[in-house]
Structures are given as C-alpha cells and as structure tokens.
Amino acid sequence: SVSAFAPICAPNQCPWGQKAFSGYFGQNKALWHQHDATLLVDSATERLPILIDQGDADGFLVEQLRPALFEEACQRNDHPLELRMQTGYDHSYFFIATFIEDHLNFHAKALGLID
C-alpha cells in the first residue's frame, strides 16, 4: 500500500517538480520520467492500493500538486486509488494531524493486521 498527503503528483508538469528534478537529474528528462508517479502508473505491474488526502483549500493544489492528473492516470490504468479531497483543509500540520490515523489504518488493513 501507498499513501500520501498533498503530494506533488506530476512533477514533470509543475514548477516545483521541474526545479527539483533539474537539481537532482539535470536536464535528462528520461531520469525525470523515472521518478514521476503520474507517468509511472502507466508502466506499473503491481496494483498496490493508494490513498491520497488533499485539502481543497490548499494554495498549491492547482499549479503545483495536480492530483487530478494522477487520478486520471490511475483510472486509465485501472489502478486502485482513493483520492480524498478534504473540504476546507490547506497544506498545514493540522491537515496531516487530522487524517494520519486513517493512513495508518489503511496500511494496517493492506497488511492484514486489522479488518
């Protein structure tokens, strides 16, 4: 199982991701593609369940985080994704503190530790 809070879902397609990938990998776009979750879903052979929580009041949502692109890739590839848009939440500690227990339970269920 995989989970994330407000991840940069398509780093090849946002300023933060492009800046980070340039710093890590230079201008070798093939290396960028090997680390972009939205692109990797197209070639994934495992279908691990994914949980993403995203606040709908997050100021980075549209330009930087772009979860809709990841959601589209998962739908296109029949990859299990639960994308939860949380009303009124931003990119803060309170957002994570509110939903961290859900993420822990998500992984515990995937591991068969709880029902």
Question: How would you describe each model-predicted region?
Answer:
Residues 1-115:
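Non-catalytic cap/lid and distal C-terminal segments of serine-dependent acyl enzymes
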